[in-house]
């Protein structure tokens, strides 16, 4: 009889530890309620205009009472997660719903402060839109015993309908920077000497922030770690001061094409620290007027003038979302300039009117041979125009 009793208890324990397809964690506290919610992801697209927007394939939702995690549930769906249903939790006032999407964090049991202190680093995986972390946090609300539904439409059967018709907003931690187009219209004084072919060029991000917070009004980290996609001569913007690091990240370099660009992290251009602006640069061989590589003495003349480096490569850098250099902006720049902001897509249009520079991480003359226009529309998208 005693053996039979222990056997039945063992079966019960196994049943309690079984996982369902939604990866539902065991309730952290005694529960008398459930929360379900619908998400609203920011309108978006991948950096390339023609690419499909990435789906949320993994979403973890946590319910907090102060610092205490009272409930957690993770849902994974290859076709995209639009809602999370039936999070076991405890009723009470001043509860907060926190969500993290497309992530690899271990979140079970973490306090609210611990979750909000999480950071991420820019890696090659982030250049695929499906690997972009998204986060969201609700205002405080009351959970009642029974079923609670957040963001569901009016008329939903529920013991407590919260934020009816207004789903929980979930937004990307990353921003996008890209070239919407590059045209070459050499000014009269250069037409008989130089040309440039964007079709054979490459693009790279320079002085891109390596780390970022994933929660907060500003996600700019306190670290002084930066990444570059191509090594160029040091300039005023190059992170080389004490405590700064500057590393190669090969994924921040690709062939030029209309719409080509990169996902990057939030950054603030600190004037007291020589700006450290995130730069999007197109580069390639400076050519003669007939489209051929420069030969002597024209190559030496171009090198001495600072138009190209020793192998004839010229760079056309654009300081992304920078207020200056004659850049022209259109669209709703609602979050200010001189910084990179999450969930913004900075789309840059260039008009090249002359040779570039051999030091793209240096300030350029006001009358540089690059016209830049930049547009901001949802994602949010910032359209920026520049003329060299």
Curated annotation (Swiss-Prot):
Q: Which GO terms describe its biological process?
A: cell adhesion
Region annotation Important for oligomerization and fimbrium assembly: residue ranges?
379-388
Which ranges of residues are annotated as propeptide in this record?
19-45
Question: Can you supply one Gene Ontology CC term for this chain's record?
Answer: cell outer membrane
Molecular function (GO) terms listed? structural molecule activity
The record's listing under InterPro entries reads: FimA_C, FimA_N, Fimbrillin
Lipidation feature positions (S-diacylglycerol cysteine): 19
Its keywords, alphabetically, are: Cell adhesion, Cell outer membrane, Fimbrium, Lipoprotein, Membrane, Palmitate, Signal, Virulence
Task: Share the record's PTM remark.
Answer: Synthesized as palmitoylated lipoprotein precursor. Efficient export to the outer membrane and integration into fimbriae requires lipidation and subsequent proteolytic removal of the lipidated propeptide.
Lipidated positions (N-palmitoyl cysteine) are 19
Site-annotated residues for Cleavage? 45-46
Any further remark recorded for this protein: The name (major fimbrium subunit) does not indicate the abundance of the protein, but is derived from the greater length of the major fimbriae. In strain ATCC 33277 and strain 381, major fimbriae are 300 - 1600 nM in length and about 5 nm in diameter. In contrast, minor fimbriae are only about 80 - 120 nm long. This length difference is observed only in a small number of strains, including strain ATCC 33277 and strain 381, and is due to a loss of function mutation in FimB, a protein that restricts fimbrial length in other strains.
Subunit structure of this entry? Answer: Fimbriae are composed of a major, structural subunit (FimA) and the minor components FimC, FimD and FimE. Head-to-tail oligomerization of FimA molecules mediates assembly of the fimbrium stalk, while the minor components probably form the fimbrium tip. Linear, head-to-tail oligomerization of FimA is mediated by a conformation change, facilitating the insertion of a C-terminal beta-strand into a groove in the N-terminal domain of the following subunit.
Instruction: Give the family this protein belongs to, as stated in its UniProt record.
Output: Belongs to the bacteroidetes fimbrillin superfamily. FimA/Mfa1 family.
Its biological purpose? Structural subunit of the major fimbriae. These long, filamentous pili are attached to the cell surface; they mediate biofilm formation, adhesion onto host cells and onto other bacteria that are part of the oral microbiome. They play an important role in the invasion of periodontal tissues. Fimbriae and their constituents are major virulence factors. FimA proteins from different strains have highly divergent sequences, and this has been used for classification. The sequence-based classification correlates with pathogenicity.
Q: What is this protein called?
A: Major fimbrium subunit FimA type-4
Organism encoding this protein: Porphyromonas gingivalis (Bacteroides gingivalis)
The top of its lineage is: Bacteria, Pseudomonadati, Bacteroidota, Bacteroidia, Bacteroidales
């Amino acid at each position: 009889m005693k053996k039979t009793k222990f056997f039945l208890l063992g079966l019960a324990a196994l049943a309690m530890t079984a996982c369902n397809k939604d990866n539902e964690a065991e309730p952290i506290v005694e529960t008398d309620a459930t929360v379900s919610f619908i998400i609203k992801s920011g309108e978006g697209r991948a950096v390339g205009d023609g690419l499909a927007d990435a789906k949320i394939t993994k979403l973890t939702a946590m319910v907090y009472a102060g610092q205490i995690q009272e409930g957690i549930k993770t849902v994974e769906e290859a076709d995209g997660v639009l809602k999370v249903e039936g999070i076991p939790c405890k009723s009470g006032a001043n509860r907060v719903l926190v969500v993290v999407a497309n992530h690899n964090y271990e979140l079970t049991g973490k306090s609210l402060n611990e979750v909000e202190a999480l950071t991420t680093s820019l890696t090659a995986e982030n250049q695929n839109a499906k690997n972009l972390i998204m986060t969201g946090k609700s205002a405080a609300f009351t959970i009642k015993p029974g079923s609670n539904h957040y963001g569901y439409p009016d008329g939903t059967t529920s013991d407590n309908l919260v934020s009816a018709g207004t789903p929980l907003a979930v937004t990307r931690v990353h921003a996008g920077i890209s070239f919407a187009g590059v045209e070459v219209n050499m000014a009269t004084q250069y037409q008989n000497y130089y040309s440039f072919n964007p079709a054979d060029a490459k693009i790279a991000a320079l002085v891109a922030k390596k780390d970022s917070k994933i929660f907060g009004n500003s996600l700019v980290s306190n670290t002084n770690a930066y990444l570059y996609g191509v090594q160029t001569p040091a300039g005023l913007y190059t992170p080389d001061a004490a405590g700064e690091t500057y590393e190669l990240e090969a994924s921040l370099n690709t062939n030029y094409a209309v719409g080509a660009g990169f996902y990057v992290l939030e950054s603030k251009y600190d004037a007291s620290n020589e700006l450290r602006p995130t730069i999007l640069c197109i580069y390639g061989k400076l050519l003669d007027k007939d489209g051929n590589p420069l030969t002597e003495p024209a190559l030496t003349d171009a090198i001495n003038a600072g138009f190209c480096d020793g192998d004839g490569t010229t760079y056309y850098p654009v300081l992304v979302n920078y207020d200056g250099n004659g850049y022209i902006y259109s669209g709703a720049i609602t979050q200010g300039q001189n910084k990179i902001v999450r969930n913004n897509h900075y789309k840059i249009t260039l008009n090249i009117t002359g040779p570039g520079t051999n030091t793209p991480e240096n300030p350029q003359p006001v009358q540089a041979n690059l016209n830049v226009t930049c547009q901001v529309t949802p994602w949010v998208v910032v359209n920026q125009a520049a003329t060299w």
